[in-house]
């Protein structure tokens, strides 16, 4: 197959789309990626990529369009989204006209898949979307608008138009199918199929890991630092826990609440208890997992977005560690089945209780949780299984 992949992010941005493209090349397919110049988490274009419009990396042909870098402000993020939308739509007009199928991955915002829609429509080929985020649901959950407002209704109309133009939708969480049926009104049940997103593949020396002070219980959170991840309640819970146990919490990542996190650490005098490490590549983040007592997962149990299976969950399970999870929805169901987590609700009290419950576990119980998570990952989320499903979907919709 000759495959066109459209995604705003690609290597060195830390997203699993890179894993997918390189897998398809290894399986003998001709793969071209249309993406933006990398800037995620850097507040600028990554050095060396400023003038790099085309490259071939591990067999993948990559076209990079100019984007306005994200700088942390809401306006810069909007400009970043719109610059990719505009420049990528222009670029697809200049691409070869002989691709067999288009594959896109929908992260926020969903307009980033518009170039894929444009190419597929122009050349009358099928478009397969891998949906990792729901619109306009995400806009509501992040507090930008509310259900029923004029802005929401306009976004809903736009979303329906875009989603209905797609030939096949792979959803990263089972509950997303309910959203497409009841909210987006896609009645043909054969259009949607549950296919998790692959775990980001990284190279790491298993003997290269961070040494913790064993006088403390050491926990790690790795991921987006935002409202959806329930960061404010986590901070309040840690503040309470410092009076109950010797605890250190290591946080890796970036997000809208990064500055809020830093301010609260200072305000509550938690410098010895919350260590913010900033953004790190997945390969480096793993170094903090090995000797940690457990990994923390938080996701606000609100709306359909709150029912998702975050990619960090499968990343955690792959690393064979116990998990403390403040979640609901599909992710909660996964962890109930794996029997590898202490699960709680989103409240401060619930989070505190979960950490106290974990503290009382003996070492064999923790080791069993770790093993359970890894075995569940191998059975349900192993990349070879998921990537093969993606390839099969593309073959089915190839002209």
Question: Which residue ranges define each predicted feature?
Answer:
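Nucleotide-sugar-dependent
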Residues: 229, 283-288, 295-317, 324-334
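An aromatic- and histidine-rich active-site surface loop
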Residues: 14, 81-88, 101-138
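Donor nucleotide-sugar binding/catalytic pocket of nucleotide-sugar-dependent glycosyltransferases
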Residues: 149-205, 274
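Conserved acidic donor-binding segment of nucleotide-sugar-dependent glycosyltransferases
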Residues: 337-349, 357-363
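A charged, aromatic-enriched C-terminal amphipathic alpha-helix characteristic of glycosyltransferases
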Residues: 346, 360-395
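Conserved donor-binding/catalytic core segment of Leloir-type glycosyltransferases
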Residues: 199, 211-238, 250
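N-terminal subdomain of nucleotide-sugar transferases
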Residues: 1-58, 239-241
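Nucleotide-activated donor-binding/catalytic signature segment of Leloir-type glycosyltransferases, i.e.
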Residues: 216, 252, 259-287
């Amino acid at each position: 197959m000759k495959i066109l992949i459209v995604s705003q992010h690609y290597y060195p941005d830390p997203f699993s789309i890179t894993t997918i493209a390189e897998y398809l090349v290894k399986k003998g397919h001709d793969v071209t990626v249309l993406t933006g110049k990398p800037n995620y988490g850097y507040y600028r274009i990554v050095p060396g990529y400023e003038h790099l419009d085309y490259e071939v990396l591990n067999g993948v042909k990559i076209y990079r369009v100019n984007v306005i870098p994200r700088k942390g402000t809401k306006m810069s993020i909007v400009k970043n989204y719109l610059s990719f939308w505009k420049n990528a739509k222009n670029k697809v007009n200049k691409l070869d006209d002989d691709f067999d199928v288009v594959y896109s991955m929908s992260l926020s915002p969903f307009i980033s898949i518009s170039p894929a829609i444009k190419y597929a429509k122009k050349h009358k080929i099928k478009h397969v979307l891998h949906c990792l985020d729901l619109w306009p649901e995400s806009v509501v959950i992040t507090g930008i608008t509310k259900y029923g407002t004029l802005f929401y209704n306009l976004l809903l109309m736009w979303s329906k138009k875009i989603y209905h133009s797609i030939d096949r939708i792979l959803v990263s969480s089972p509950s997303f199918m309910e959203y497409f049926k009841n909210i987006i009104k896609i009645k043909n049940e054969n259009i949607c199929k549950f296919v998790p997103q692959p775990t980001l593949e990284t190279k790491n020396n298993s003997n290269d890991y961070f040494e913790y002070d064993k006088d403390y219980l050491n926990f790690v959170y790795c991921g987006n630092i935002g409202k959806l991840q329930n960061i404010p309640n986590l901070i309040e819970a840690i503040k309470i826990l410092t009076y109950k146990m010797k605890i250190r919490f290591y946080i890796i990542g970036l997000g809208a609440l990064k500055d809020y996190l830093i301010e609260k650490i200072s305000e509550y005098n938690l410098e010895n208890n919350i260590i913010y490490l900033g953004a790190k590549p997945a390969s480096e983040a793993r170094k903090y997992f090995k000797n940690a007592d457990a990994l923390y997962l938080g996701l606000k149990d609100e709306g359909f977005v709150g029912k998702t299976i975050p990619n960090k969950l499968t990343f955690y399970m792959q690393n064979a560690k116990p998990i403390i999870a403040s979640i609901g929805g599909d992710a909660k169901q996964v962890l109930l089945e794996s029997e590898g987590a202490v699960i709680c609700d989103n409240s401060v009290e619930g989070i505190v209780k979960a950490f106290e419950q974990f503290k009382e576990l003996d070492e064999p119980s923790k080791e069993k949780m770790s093993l359970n998570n890894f075995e569940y990952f191998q059975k349900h989320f192993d990349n070879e299984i998921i990537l093969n499903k993606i390839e099969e979907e593309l073959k089915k919709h190839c002209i």
